[in-house]
Amino acid sequence: MIIKWNKEKDELLKATRNISFEQVVEEINAHRNTKPETNPVHQNQFITVVKINNYPCVVPFVIEENGDWFLKTVYPCRKMKGRL
């Protein structure tokens, strides 16, 4: 599995949320038990929850036909504190 993302979106996330897709990938690789769940808002997407800067963050993504993950965005979510 390869994890991909849009470079422009990554720069926007760094500037606006102080979070990068590189941090997400590091967290996913460090915790192999990261389980994709169906995104309740977008049925064609999945989500996973990772901890960035000691705070839970939701990462929506799509799984491509070859099994690669394409990250859409990442956002902090206090509602997920109990999940980590």
Label every PLM stretch briefly.
Residues 1-84:
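Ribonuclease/tRNase effector modules and their secretory precursors
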